[in-house]
């Protein structure tokens, strides 16, 4: 693993987590070490996993531009829930730009 780049390590970690077929997948900045194209591919994979396999995917991010893909958005500030919104029509990752 030490010979892999940060982005490669991140992709391997996500692949290992998905291989376990979890009911809940917690992703802290899943695109943080990735380029734009690979980041979109990973987000698409996570969205498809959620929709097709019924896995609950929690994405923690500072990138508010990706919130349209979420079913629910929870904003936390200083450890306190600041707001919570439900999104009845989540956008496809393909339509999101940042």
Over which residues does each language-model region extend?
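ABC family nucleotide-binding domain
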Residues: 1-69
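Conserved beta-strand-loop-alpha-helix hinge in the C-terminal portion
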Residues: 80-98
């Amino acid at each position: 693993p030490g010979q892999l780049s940060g982005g490669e390590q991140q992709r391997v970690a996500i692949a290992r987590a998905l291989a376990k077929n979890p009911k809940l997948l917690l992703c802290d900045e899943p695109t943080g070490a990735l380029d734009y194209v690979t980041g979109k591919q990973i987000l698409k994979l996570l969205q498809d996993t959620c929709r097709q396999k019924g896995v609950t995917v929690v994405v923690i991010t500072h990138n508010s531009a990706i919130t349209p893909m979420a079913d629910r958005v929870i904003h936390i500030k200083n450890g306190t829930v600041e707001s919570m919104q439900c999104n009845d029509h989540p956008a496809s990752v393909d339509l999101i730009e940042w």
